[in-house]
């Protein structure tokens, strides 16, 4: 998935972080995280550092304040640079840059990310799924609407195989479906996405596990599957702020060119420009790459 793209970027920026040269060896490459933030690096990646403020300064530079917890104890740090590209969740940007114009803040805050749940289910024996002759299941009106064998990544030096009698991982996903308030005709898709996020936060592990086992038993019980016996482990990845918001004709106005909220929100502000998929109102990696290209170009043309 996109993790491999990120790993390729990091290795290109900091060659000492991992061996190898291209996509064919990136999956198995062992990364040395101690190389990410060396003082003599041309490019530095600083983990465990949460930005809390970004501001244009009078000397034509940009200051970024962040909380550093890399040493165990939290400390406030401020760094300066000529330029800054904000590539984080758009709705948080007005809190990091309070000097932004009100109209731009509103544009940045308009979108509501889709909450998602990604689950990995380790089966003791994948042979039961093999009996069905199917590896991808769409399950409308079920608790989990997509179940499949985990997508395999195959590269030159990484070629996994599925063998009968051996463990198998199922990939399970859904978007928490809140019930629409029938007494509120003005309820929008953004309202529903927010309600879904709150539902996701309230759910315990058992709230995810119970309907999953019930659904898998219904789907595969005829092939001898018993969830209590055949499931070795379950991992639940809650993604409260998942996909970037896509406009929906049923709920959103039709804006003129350059007037959509994401277009207003991403306008350069001094020496600060804006990237990430939110700034394109498009959730996928090509949208994020387009945003990166645009934001860098905006800096170079200043």
Identify the function of each model-found stretch.
Residues 1, 5-9, 47-50, 92, ...:
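Alpha-helical packing segments of well-folded alpha/beta enzyme cores
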Residues 1-4, 8-24:
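Low-complexity, highly charged intrinsically disordered N-terminal segments
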Residues 2, 13, 51, 168, ...:
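C-terminal substrate/ligand-recognition segments
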Residues 18-25, 33-52:
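A conserved beta-strand/loop element that lines the FAD pocket in flavoprotein oxidoreductases
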Residues 40, 49, 79, 229, ...:
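Structured loop/turn residues at beta-strand edges in well-structured enzyme cores
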Residues 43, 47-182:
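Mid-domain catalytic core of redox enzymes
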Residues 122, 128-302:
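Conserved flavin/dinucleotide-binding core of flavoenzymes
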């Amino acid at each position: 998935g996109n993790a491999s793209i990120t790993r390729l970027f990091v290795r290109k920026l900091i060659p000492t972080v991992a061996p190898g040269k291209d996509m064919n060896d990136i999956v198995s490459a062992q990364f040395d995280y101690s190389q990410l933030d060396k003082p003599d690096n041309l490019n530095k990646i600083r983990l465990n550092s949460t930005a809390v403020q970004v501001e244009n300064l009078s000397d034509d530079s940009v200051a970024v304040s962040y909380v550093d917890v890399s040493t165990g104890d939290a400390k406030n740090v401020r760094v300066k640079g000529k330029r800054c590209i904000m590539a984080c969740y758009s709705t948080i940007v007005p809190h990091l840059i309070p000097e932004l114009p009100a109209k731009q803040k509103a544009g940045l805050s308009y979108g509501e990310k889709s909450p998602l749940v990604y689950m990995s289910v380790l089966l003791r024996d994948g042979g039961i799924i093999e009996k069905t002759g199917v590896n991808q299941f769409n399950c409308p009106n079920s608790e989990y609407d997509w179940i499949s064998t985990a997508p395999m990544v195959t590269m030159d030096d990484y070629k996994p195989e599925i063998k009968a009698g051996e463990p198998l991982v199922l990939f399970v996903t859904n978007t928490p479906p809140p019930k629409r308030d029938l007494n509120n005709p003005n309820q929008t898709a953004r309202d529903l996405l927010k309600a879904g996020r709150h539902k996701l936060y309230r759910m315990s592990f058992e709230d995810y596990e119970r309907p999953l086992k019930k659904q898998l038993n219904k789907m595969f019980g005829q092939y001898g599957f018993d969830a209590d016996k055949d499931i070795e482990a379950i991992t639940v990845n809650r993604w409260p702020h998942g996909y970037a918001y896509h406009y929906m004709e049923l709920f959103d106005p039709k804006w003129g060119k350059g007037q959509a909220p994401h277009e207003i929100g991403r306008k350069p502000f001094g020496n600060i420009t804006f990237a990430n998929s939110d700034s394109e109102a498009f959730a996928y990696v090509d949208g994020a790459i387009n945003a990166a290209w645009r934001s860098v170009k905006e800096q170079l043309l200043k």
